[in-house]
């Protein structure tokens, strides 16, 4: 039981850390490419935030 909780906590923390670092990088790339690529393509890549 303890090992299961530990494994789940580790898995969730990895996902949170990954999303924390990936999301700003995506938005930065989106902002740079916005002038070159059409905005609707940028929205598809970056989601509603971009």
Curated annotation (Swiss-Prot):
Residues 1-27 form the signal peptide. One of its GO terms (cellular component) is extracellular region. It comes from the Eukaryota. Keywords: Amidation, Disulfide bond, Formylation, Ion channel impairing toxin, Mast cell degranulation, Neurotoxin, Potassium channel impairing toxin, Secreted, Signal, Toxin. The modification N6-formyllysine is found at residues 29, 44, 48. It is found in: Secreted. Transmembrane segments: none annotated. The modification Asparagine amide is found at residue 49. It holds the Pfam family Bee_toxin. Potent anti-inflammatory agent. At low concentrations, mediates the degranulation of mast cells thus evoking an inflammatory response. Also acts as a neurotoxin capable of blocking a class of voltage-gated potassium channels. This is Mast cell degranulating peptide.
């Amino acid at each position: 039981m303890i090992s299961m909780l530990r494994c789940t906590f580790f898995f969730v923390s990895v996902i949170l850390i990954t999303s924390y670092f990936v999301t700003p990088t995506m938005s930065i790339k989106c902002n740079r490419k916005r002038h070159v690529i059409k905005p609707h393509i940028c929205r598809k890549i970056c989601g509603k935030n971009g």
